[in-house]
Amino acid sequence: TTQIPALGTDDINVLTSRQVGVLTEDQLQTLSVAQVQAIASGSLKTLSSDQIRTLSTEQLAGMSTSQIRGFEYTQIPAFSSDQISNLTTTEIGAFSTRQMQAFTTAQVAAFTSWQVPAIPVENIANMGTTQTVAFSTAQLSAFTSQQVAALTADQINAFSNTQRATLGL
């Protein structure tokens, strides 16, 4: 653990997926934001749920869009609500449709009003109804007109009257 902070970003960048996957939670916690940014995006798919939950909000917020896309959709439910609410709008926009479909209702509820407009329209359209009904009225108020237009009939029908009214539907 004491040797990890001494690794340069060039050293981190050449770690294999297997090496990244066996980093302990303590070792992951000691990585600087710059070191996390140096992890190859393809290596992130080897992180366990516990390892993902160990990452600080600062470490996650420092990740590139290719790193965000490097997570498997099956890993998405491991992110805590706090981690989700601290992602940048660029990172929110980087999630693939498949990744977005893996978000839990608690994670959807964790989006801030400044993050919601960054959710790509195609991701909104492909979210399940259990996900979309998890949006609060404050979050729905932050929807762009394009996001509202992308909602499917099933999604709209699943909303409460209050949610539909918030969207002007």
Q: Each predicted region: which residue ranges?
A:
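General marker for long, soluble alpha-helical cores
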Residues: 1-169
